[in-house]
Amino acid sequence: MIQSTGVTHTDKSAQENPVKYRDNFTPVIITGMSGAGLSTAARVLEDLGWYVAHNIPPQIILELIDMCAREDSPVDKVAVVCDVRSREFRGSLTQVVSELRDKQLDPTVLFLEARDEVLIKRFDNVRRTHPLQGSQTLQVGIERERTVLSPVKEDASVVIDTSDLSVHDLRRAIESSFRTIATRTQHVTIESFGFKHGSPRDADFVVDVRFLPNPFWVPELRPFRGVDKPVSDYVLSQKGAEEFLNNFVDMLKDMLPGYRHEGKNFITIGVGCTGGHHRSVAVSEELAKRIADQTTLDVSVVHRDINRH
């Protein structure tokens, strides 16, 4: 007997000839908020050579991935897109992920989200209704979806907030993440931001560099940004900057073995200052250089608010 979820085999021949899965097979499940960029994520993975199945109900995901993972399967990389348009979504996706892990087919769950006001604007732009709004408002539909997806997000391998990302930014973020999956390395994203615009929602931890003097108050530096050498030299030469950078990199190196043991291959560090133009940008760039030089991590840098007013 084979059931869609909670697969149970009572077939004697199956017991005598256990299924053989290919080595290093890592399936991907793409999910998240409607309007957050699931279709873009799917296209990126297709361009990277993944076989992508769209809008697959959770009860079918287990069977599809099991089939693709077998040694005799012609598909070596598979990703499935699963969203709340599937009536069976509620509660069942987390169950499927758990069952895949029990079968040693540990999936990478990519979860995309965005702020409510951003999602509302995106839906308004394309003149579409939300799949869960029914006869209610768009805001109600988004709130319902966030509640449904909360346990999925908590268990996700990679969470990307697309609120402030262009399509090209999202593509780069996904490409970087999935190169990491292919090579089995750990990846750290350093994201500079301005506290006045809010902290990154997908950061694992946040660093506040407002203890450093603000170049904004130096007239000749104000027009520049933290990626420019005059600002970078000013920020990094301030008292406490060198000590902070050394201590932070040392702390991260101490944490890496624990992260690796827990299977956490994606680490996001938010580095914040007031506006996200000067101090956080300069410190993020320098942190990225030092982490790349002193660890085996793949490193990428995102300056979320560098052009934001």
From Swiss-Prot:
Keyword GTP-binding attributed: yes
Single GO MF descriptor: ATP binding
Keywords for the protein's UniProt record, in alphabetical order: ATP-binding, GTP-binding, Nucleotide-binding
Entry-linked InterPro entries: P-loop_NTPase (IPR027417), RapZ-like (IPR005337), RapZ-like_N (IPR053930), RapZ_C (IPR053931)
Positions annotated to bind ATP: 32-39
Binding site for GTP: 83-86
Pfam families xrefs: PapZ_C, RapZ-like_N
Family annotation (SUPFAM superfamilies): P-loop containing nucleoside triphosphate hydrolases
Family: Belongs to the RapZ-like family.
Record's protein name: Nucleotide-binding protein Cgl1591/cg1794
Source organism per UniProt: Corynebacterium glutamicum (strain ATCC 13032 / DSM 20300 / JCM 1318 / BCRC 11384 / CCUG 27702 / LMG 3730 / NBRC 12168 / NCIMB 10025 / NRRL B-2784 / 534)
